[in-house]
């Protein structure tokens, strides 16, 4: 968990360098710094462990704030939800990098870190009983998640239903970066490939199916026009049920 925390801190300061600063009056009190950021001292030195816990929570909230700013431009170009209900499926699982990312997207790490903070405030007994593995909790469908490149995807479907070519590299000021997509799909080698876990097969037909959501990526259409478009990628594995009729 220490390694995870350090990874998030490094990612956070990288975001700080890239994120645009807004007007001071938006932040309040005439400060251009992000809320919750300390310029000196350590979390442990601020009145003991309780203050450290408050500091960690504040830091986690700061991550969310930075992420909101980084995705601010994407939200401006987000499709009109009244005209396309599929816009609700928009998600951020794209990263531009010179090498394969070693961790899931920052939003996933942030959620995991918050869960860690919640667990840290529990007693050992409560924490032990809240562990899903100890409660016997299992996923209805087995899934796998991994980073893939445009070389793996090659083509995708955009929001208008057309097939576009996913560009492998994105030009930047100092060269080129590869587009990586964090995809989640049903595990073909898992125990649920023949049906969902925990479903009464006497009354239901079940199947684990991979579903998709929209992400924004650099693509080229059939007319050789290059631009940022919303495309579909695999993002989850869900269970679908149909009732069995009379035999």
Curated annotation (Swiss-Prot):
Disulfide bonds join 141-208, 186-237, 196-239. It is found in: Secreted. The lineage of its organism: Eukaryota, Metazoa, Chordata, Craniata, Vertebrata. GO terms for cellular component: axon; dendrite; extracellular space; synaptic vesicle. The keyword Glycoprotein applies. Monomers and homodimers. Binds to NTRK2/TRKB. Can form heterodimers with other neurotrophin family members, such as NTF3 and NTF4 (in vitro), but the physiological relevance of this is not clear. BDNF precursor form: interacts with the heterodimer formed by NGFR and SORCS2. Mature BDNF has much lower affinity for the heterodimer formed by NGFR and SORCS2. This is Neurotrophic factor BDNF precursor form. Residues 1-18 form the signal peptide. Pfam families: NGF. InterPro entries: Brain-der_neurotrophic_factor, Cystine-knot_cytokine, Nerve_growth_factor-like, Nerve_growth_factor-rel, Nerve_growth_factor_CS. It comes from Ailurus fulgens. Mature BDNF is produced by proteolytic removal of the propeptide, catalyzed by a FURIN family member. In addition, the precursor form is proteolytically cleaved within the propeptide, but this is not an obligatory intermediate for the production of mature BDNF. Can be converted into mature BDNF by plasmin (PLG). The record marks 57-58 as: Cleavage. Residues 19-128 form a propeptide.
């Amino acid at each position: 968990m220490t390694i995870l925390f350090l990874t998030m801190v490094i990612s956070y300061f990288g975001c700080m360098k890239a994120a645009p600063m807004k007007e001071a009056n938006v932040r309040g009190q005439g400060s251009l710094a992000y809320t919750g950021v300390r310029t000196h001292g350590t979390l442990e030195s601020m009145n003991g462990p309780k203050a450290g816990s408050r500091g960690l929570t504040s830091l986690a909230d700061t991550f969310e704030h930075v992420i909101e700013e980084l995705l601010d431009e994407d939200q401006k170009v987000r499709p009109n939800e009244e005209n396309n209900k599929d816009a609700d499926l928009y998600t951020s699982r794209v990263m531009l990098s010179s090498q394969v990312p070693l961790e899931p997207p920052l939003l996933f790490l942030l959620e995991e870190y918050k869960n860690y903070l919640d667990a840290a405030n529990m007693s050992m007994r409560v924490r032990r009983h809240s562990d899903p593995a100890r409660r016997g909790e299992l996923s209805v469908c087995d899934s796998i998640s991994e980073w893939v490149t445009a070389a793996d995807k090659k083509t995708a479907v955009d929001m208008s239903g057309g097939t576009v070519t996913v560009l492998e590299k994105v030009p930047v000021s100092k060269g080129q970066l590869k587009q990586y997509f964090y995809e989640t799909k049903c595990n073909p080698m898992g125990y649920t490939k023949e049906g969902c876990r925990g479903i009464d097969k006497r009354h239901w037909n079940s199947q684990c199916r991979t579903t998709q959501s929209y992400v924004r990526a650099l693509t080229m259409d059939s007319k050789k026009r290059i631009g940022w478009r919303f495309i579909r990628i695999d993002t989850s594995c869900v269970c679908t049920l149909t009732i069995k009729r009379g035999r």
